């Protein structure tokens, strides 16, 4: 029987998880030809799902073979995804060994009309930026590179200390590229939504507000869908966003900027697909044949190594010469950094978290109406709590993690948000009296108020950041001078430009170095240097002071951080990683299996290890229990796999795709513990 000319076979990827051992697309019958990228509704396993059309072909005589195809229910929107988005989705799916439908779901926002008008960013008068020679040279190098030539490297690393004018380079590069081709679009990636208000303020001063859009988890589903459509039509020229912005339907990109490129927040580690937006952005730049710039005061070890090996063009910016720019207080160029040995504080009977040196500097800053940032990388009133009767640590029943005492009187788990009542009981002896050990943001706040009861304090940590518009409010209040002291975790360590901040206190540097992870030293160095860079900004009236508190002042990373000695830090870390074949010299996949039954976990991981250890060219760790042994009631066990840089062995990839439900495959993890 001949196929009818009006019938077509449509290949559709359902927007759901399909096992990697199966084909990621399904064939359906349609009376009409449906273009690739179209969003459709399809029947699948007694359910109706949305899917994306991958391709179309003519029907063929299949009745003799007994092949019956279901029909597509309806076309929701034609060409919903662009060809570039489909190509990018396939790359992410292949590299991160993640189901294509799960990946594509990130490219499809909920189709909801915004209840209110999109937020106006505010039209501001365009300013003129006076560039230094080094800044101008950087702009020229970026903007005049022709990416259509295959021999030209269009990837750059912009490396310069905090306050060196990297943002000014981005803005001028965008302006020059846009002047030559007004149809181009630009993507500015920021690591966290906390940096959104300042990014809007800075870019909004130079570009039309109606051409700028923000994409982050802070905006509503309706606003996101509206923004998506405007990007697709070309109405929006500049997109400022967190990692989710890389999925937007850009028509023609001219430049991608990855600001604070060292930040681990660019990696999605807690759900599929476990992608790194920095690597995905590089592929997006290749697809659009556009330039891409990574910028940082403390580049990741891998990025700097790649720049030294000519994979990126290295552009270095010196610290701004304020005298050259005509800024009065040019003599305030050097930050005074002190390392305080907290062992000596204990010998002197000071048992608080605030050293005498830091207390003195806080008093001085408050006296002269200057602002202070106190950095502690842990929220709550303590690190953990123990039963006073039997010394048992109070733990989460679902995750087995130590619970953190909050000033509301309850204990909370940072992993699953489990909360106790106000009077929890010890699981072992039934005791109700607990001693809180260690530090957190709330305990530091309490101690500061004991010393300085009139000080106005803001606290920025992950517990508070869940409140709507919290980031905008905290930045607005502190930049307007409504608070004297900002106490916060990682979210305050980068990006914020606050000229009145003259003092930085790093309360517990040891906490940053305490994890047995190969990334720990890099994270610690970056955190200390980044948060120190919040002081002594251009326009400051007082010299910057940084106080680093530690029980191990002899620690090399603490010393190099205090000196802001990136070169020596880089050489130390690279030497260690080369010896162990760790990134950037090798690649890593972290395999985690989790289940409510511990015996099943043991068996699954043991069976997988047996199959994997026979593969040539890979090195495996023994199956082991990770730092977090249980999450939300599920037991966990993991295997770390190392193999040569970038290219995953074909046999390993096949075995990983065979793994069933319960397995987590994390390529290029940000932690191996």
Which residues fall in each region the model found?
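Terminal, basic amphipathic appendages of nucleotide-handling enzymes
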Residues: 2-146, 154-155, 163, 340
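Short, flexible turn/loop "capping" segments at secondary-structure junctions
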Residues: 18-21, 580-586, 630-633
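Short, intrinsically disordered low-complexity segments
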Residues: 48, 622-650
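Inter-lobe coupling/hinge segments of SF2-like helicase ATPases
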Residues: 127, 132, 155-237, 241-602, ...
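Short secondary-structure junctions
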Residues: 452-455, 612-620, 660-661
């Amino acid at each position: 029987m001949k196929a009818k000319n009006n019938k077509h076979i449509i290949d559709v990827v359902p927007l759901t998880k399909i096992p990697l051992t199966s084909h990621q697309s399904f064939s359906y019958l349609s009376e009409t030809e449906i273009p690739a990228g179209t969003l459709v509704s399809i029947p699948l396993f007694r359910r109706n799902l949305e899917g994306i059309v991958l391709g179309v072909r003519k029907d063929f005589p299949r009745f003799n073979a007994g092949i019956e195809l279901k029909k597509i229910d309806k076309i929701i929107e034609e060409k919903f995804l662009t060809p570039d988005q489909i190509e990018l989705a396939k790359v992410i799916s292949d590299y991160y060994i993640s189901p294509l439908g799960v990946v594509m779901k990130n490219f499809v926002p909920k189709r909801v009309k915004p209840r209110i008008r999109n937020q106006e960013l505010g039209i501001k008068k365009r300013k003129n930026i006076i560039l230094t020679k080094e800044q101008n040279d950087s702009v020229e190098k970026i903007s005049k590179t022709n990416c259509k030539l295959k021999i030209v490297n269009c990837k750059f690393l912009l490396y310069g200390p905090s306050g060196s004018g990297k943002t000014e380079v981005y803005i001028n590069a965008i302006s020059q590229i846009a002047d030559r081709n007004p149809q181009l679009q630009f993507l500015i990636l920021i690591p966290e939504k906390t940096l959104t208000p300042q990014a809007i303020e800075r870019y909004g001063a130079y570009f039309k507000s109606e051409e700028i859009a923000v994409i982050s988890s802070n905006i509503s589903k309706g606003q996101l869908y509206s923004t998506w459509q405007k990007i697709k039509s070309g109405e929006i020229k500049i997109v400022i966003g967190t990692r989710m912005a890389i999925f937007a339907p850009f028509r023609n990109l001219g430049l991608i900027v990855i600001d604070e490129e060292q930040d681990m927040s660019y990696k999605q580690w807690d759900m599929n697909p476990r992608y790194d937006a920095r690597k995905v952005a590089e592929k997006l730049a290749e697809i659009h044949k556009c330039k891409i710039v990574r910028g940082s005061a403390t580049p990741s070890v891998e990025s700097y190594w790649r720049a030294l090996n000519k994979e990126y063009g290295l552009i270095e910016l010196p610290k701004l010469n304020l005298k050259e720019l005509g800024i009065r207080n040019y003599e305030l160029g050097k930050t005074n950094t002190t390392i305080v040995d907290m062992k000596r504080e204990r010998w002197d009977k000071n048992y608080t978290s605030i050293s005498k040196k830091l207390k003195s500097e806080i008093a001085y800053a408050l006296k002269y109406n200057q602002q202070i940032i106190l950095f502690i990388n842990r929220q709550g009133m303590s690190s953990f709590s123990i039963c006073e009767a039997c010394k048992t640590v109070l733990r989460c029943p679902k995750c087995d993690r130590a619970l953190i005492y909050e000033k509301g009187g309850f204990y909370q788990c940072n992993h699953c948000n489990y909360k106790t009542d106000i009077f929890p009981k010890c699981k072992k002896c039934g005791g109700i009296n607990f001693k809180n050990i260690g530090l957190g943001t709330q305990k530091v706040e309490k101690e500061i108020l004991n010393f300085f009861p009139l000080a106005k304090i803001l606290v920025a940590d992950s517990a508070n950041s869940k409140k709507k518009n919290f980031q905008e409010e905290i930045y607005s209040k502190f930049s307007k001078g409504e608070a004297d002291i900002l106490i916060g975790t990682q979210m305050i360590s980068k990006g914020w430009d606050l000229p009145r901040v003259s003092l930085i206190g790093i309360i517990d540097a040891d906490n940053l170095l305490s994890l047995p992870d190969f990334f720990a030293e890099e994270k610690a160095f970056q955190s200390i240097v980044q948060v120190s860079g919040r002081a002594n900004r251009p326009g400051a009236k007082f010299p910057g002071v940084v106080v680093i508190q530690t029980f191990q002042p002899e620690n090399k990373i603490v010393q190099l951080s205090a000196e802001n000695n990136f070169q020596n830090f880089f050489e130390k870390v690279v030497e260690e990683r080369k010896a162990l074949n760790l990134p950037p010299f090798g690649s890593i996949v972290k395999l985690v299996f989790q289940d409510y039954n511990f015996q099943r976990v043991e068996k699954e991981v043991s069976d997988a290890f047996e199959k994997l250890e026979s593969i040539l060219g890979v090195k495996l760790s023994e199956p082991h229990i990770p730092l977090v042994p249980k999450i939300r009631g599920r037991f966990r066990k993991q295997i770390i796999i190392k193999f040569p840089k970038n290219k995953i062995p074909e046999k390993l990839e096949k075995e990983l795709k065979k793994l069933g439900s319960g397995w987590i495959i994390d390529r290029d993890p940000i932690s191996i513990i």
